[in-house]
Amino acid sequence: MHVSKRWLAGLALGVFSLSAQADITVHDIEGRDVTLEKPAEHIVLAEGRQLIALSLLDTNPAHWLLGWGSDMKRSPELYDIYHKRAPELDDLPIVGDGPGPGSISVERIISMNPDAVVLSRSQIPVSQGQELMHQLDAAGIPVVFIDFATDPLDDTVPSLRALGTLLGREDQAERYIRFYEQKRQAVLDRVGQISKADRPTVMIEAHAGMGECCNSPGQGSFDYFAKRLNVDNIGADVLKGKSGRIDPEYVLTRDPEVYIATGGGYLRQVNGLVLGPDVSESEARQSLKHILERPLIGHLSAVENGRVHGLYHHLINTPLNILVLEQMAKWSYPDRFKDIDAQRTLEEINEHYISDPFMGSLWVDLKK
């Protein structure tokens, strides 16, 4: 049988084409294109909290992990959600314990030989992670950046899309993305119809009850929600960084129309605002009332008018941050967003999208 050189060349080209088609390219949150021969099967999460994002892509998110950051274990109310299904998380190796590249054990990651490492931009910016990335690249380990903390409303979709591509779970990622974008746009379209004269002043007290009043978001993070909602976050007017302390006299002078406190289970020991998946509504409301007993806060018009609210702090840096947008919209413009129901949105997420439901009190209102 005679086999022509042209036929062999065509066969080789076809095999090469199939091989090339098997490659995947992940476009990450930093605009980097990261190429892998095939979807990752085992990864390392430098920030353990990103397990929540994984749980929107797979019913058993823990099975993807070879190692993770310790932050999830420092949030027991979040850790317990996933530990119930995956007790093996107790033994999952820790690769880092905080922000900055110096907190990451490159040697431990390399010894695990993961298919990829997922870094959070808010934890390790590219500008600070060059040496870390160089070492991992030298070991043949791709690095993908995602983020849900710095600019949540803009970064959630591309971060989920990158994670979906990385793991070969594009369909699951796009399913939640469609839901997220529809909910987000429903709020933002209505905000666009609100005049500047109706723009309320809002005070956001972060980690309410931890130390003296008042810790506030400055630029970024919560303030991005405020800006997209066309509300005036009084902290952003005086704080140039991401967060800081605002002067009590300044707070009294501005006398915000709406007061939003953030907190979590980590504030129980200091009698701060307690919210989260493991918190009852009665405990959440009682803790909100307690922080209002402080002399400064108790004199605000927002308190006198009953426009006082509490929000679980850790919601903002997860793909569930759509709940933050809906709640802040309703609190800021109660007459215009009467039909917005974040509780119903949470129920939809729990029923149709996330592997392990989020229950408990994720927000609370002061009922007079």
Residue ranges, per PLM feature:
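Pocket-lining segment of extracytoplasmic ligand-binding domains
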Residues: 234-250, 255-279
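A short, structured surface patch at a secondary-structure boundary
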Residues: 51-111, 116, 120-125
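Extracytoplasmic ligand-binding site segments that recognize negatively charged/polar headgroups
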Residues: 72-77, 121-131, 146-159, 195-224
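Structured C-terminal subdomain patch of bacterial secreted/periplasmic proteins
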Residues: 96-97, 151-165, 268-368
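Bacterial Sec-exported substrate-binding components of ABC uptake systems
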Residues: 20-55, 171-205, 337-368
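Short helix-initiation/N-cap motifs at beta->coil->alpha
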Residues: 29-31, 92-105, 239-247
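Bacterial N-terminal signal peptides
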Residues: 9-17
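Alpha-helical, coiled-coil/dimerization segments enriched in small aliphatic residues
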Residues: 214-241
